[in-house]
């Protein structure tokens, strides 16, 4: 929504409509993706999990099932996060991520060859004023974030880091958070803008709607199926900033 208002003198009577509101629309193009995995409990024989393997019929329980499934879900979450930022719909199992959506449509900032701090300042100053709100953030990869932290420590700016384990910190002199996101790992990109400018679309009540784990008597194996639809979109790409680090 683009809103333009005009304040008028109200000394007299009457009604003089001025200003406008324009509704813009950008479509989310979700992609249906899935994960299918299969487990044969006999393959666990000879491993640390073998003592829980029950071969007898009617004992269809996968040893350490909770740990197996929990690890799969963690990896699915990591893969989705990376795709949210770096995905390309031309790649199987991926949808266009934020970087792809912003390609050629966002503002750009220049990397400073001598200082990560100066690079972040360049990103901040490249933001249009309309994008500098309470929910504005600068998103960086873990490798950039950690290098910036070390640079600040070398400058004896310990006071800006309230918690050594924090994943975000205010950019000095601004109200903008610098946030470390794993989804940007290896991208050599920095993204800045309002959080409310980015939208994620899923198919039903959550982002992993179909989740089935069962024992197949036909093949005598355990099977896992996860299927969901996911997509991202940016309402106003020209209010975002992308900085390339290479």
Report the location of each language-model feature:
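Assembly/oligomerization interface modules of large self-assembling protein complexes
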Residues: 1-49
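Sequence/fold signature of self-assembling virion shell proteins
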Residues: 1-4, 96, 100-115, 150-246
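Residues at beta-strand starts and edge strands
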Residues: 31-33, 66, 134, 220-222
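Helix N-cap / beta->alpha transition motif
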Residues: 38-47, 140-144, 193-194, 236
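Short loop/turn segments at secondary-structure transitions that flank enzyme active sites
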Residues: 43, 78, 104, 144-146, ...
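Alpha-helical scaffold segments that mediate packing/assembly in large oligomeric complexes
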Residues: 48-126, 245-246
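Short coil/turn segments at secondary-structure boundaries
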Residues: 84-89, 136-141, 161, 165
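Ordered core of a single globular domain
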Residues: 118-155
């Amino acid at each position: 929504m683009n809103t333009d208002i005009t304040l008028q003198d109200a000394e007299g009577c009457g009604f003089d409509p001025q200003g406008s509101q324009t509704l813009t629309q950008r479509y989310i193009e979700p992609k249906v993706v899935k994960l299918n995995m299969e487990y044969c409990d006999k393959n666990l024989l000879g491993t640390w999990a073998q003592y829980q393997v029950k071969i007898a019929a009617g004992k269809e329980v996968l040893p350490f099932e909770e740990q197996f499934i929990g690890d799969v879900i963690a990896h699915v979450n990591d893969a989705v996060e990376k795709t949210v930022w770096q995905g390309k719909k031309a790649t199987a199992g991926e949808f266009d991520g934020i970087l792809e959506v912003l390609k050629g449509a966002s503002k750009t900032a220049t990397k400073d060859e001598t200082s990560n701090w100066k690079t972040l300042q360049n990103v901040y100053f490249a933001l249009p004023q309309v994008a500098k709100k309470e929910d504005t953030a600068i998103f960086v990869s873990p490798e950039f974030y950690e290098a910036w932290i070390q640079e600040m420590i070398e400058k004896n700016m310990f006071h800006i880091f309230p918690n050594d384990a924090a994943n975000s910190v205010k950019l000095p002199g601004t109200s903008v958070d610098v946030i470390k996101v794993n989804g940007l790992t290896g991208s050599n990109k920095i993204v800045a803008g309002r959080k409310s400018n980015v939208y994620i679309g899923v198919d039903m009540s959550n982002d992993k709607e179909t989740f089935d784990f069962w024992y197949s008597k036909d093949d005598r194996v355990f099977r896992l199926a996860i299927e969901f639809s996911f997509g991202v979109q940016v309402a106003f790409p020209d209010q975002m900033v992308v900085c390339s680090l290479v």
